[in-house]
């Protein structure tokens, strides 16, 4: 169920401060964050945000299409290695 419109988007304050500083300085370095739950705001467009996936920080270049989504949607936490091969098909 989506968040109520009267509450507005959620973003961690420490991440918002880092984004504001990066926009102000026109900094090209990735902004490192562990906050996967924060929503992508229009002021983040064009920034590279390094989102933690539980093991490492995955760089995510924010585009216009990503606004309104959560940061965690773009940094996969699980590694898919494929299903086991069918033993009958090998013969």
From Swiss-Prot:
Gene Ontology CC terms, in alphabetical order: cytoplasm; small ribosomal subunit
Short name of any one Pfam family annotated for the protein: Ribosomal_S19
Gene name per UniProt: rpsS
Keywords: Ribonucleoprotein, Ribosomal protein, RNA-binding, rRNA-binding
Signal peptide span: none
Biological process annotations from GO: ribosomal small subunit assembly; translation
InterPro entries xrefs: Ribosomal_uS19 (IPR002222), Ribosomal_uS19_bac-type (IPR005732), Ribosomal_uS19_CS (IPR020934), Ribosomal_uS19_SF (IPR023575)
Entry similarity comment: Belongs to the universal ribosomal protein uS19 family.
Its job: Protein S19 forms a complex with S13 that binds strongly to the 16S ribosomal RNA.
GO molecular function per UniProt: rRNA binding; structural constituent of ribosome
Taxonomic lineage from the root: Bacteria, Pseudomonadati, Pseudomonadota, Gammaproteobacteria, Pseudomonadales
Source taxon at top rank: Bacteria
Protein name: Small ribosomal subunit protein uS19
């Amino acid at each position: 169920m989506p968040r109520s419109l009267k509450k507005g988007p959620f973003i961690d304050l420490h991440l918002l401060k880092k984004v504001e500083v990066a926009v102000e300085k026109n900094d090209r370095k990735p902004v490192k964050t562990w906050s996967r739950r924060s929503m992508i705001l229009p002021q983040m467009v064009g920034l590279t945000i390094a989102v933690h996936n539980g093991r490492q920080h995955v760089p995510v270049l924010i585009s216009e299409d990503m606004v309104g989504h959560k940061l965690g949607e773009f940094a996969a936490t699980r590694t898919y290695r494929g299903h086991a091969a069918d033993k009958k098909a090998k013969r």
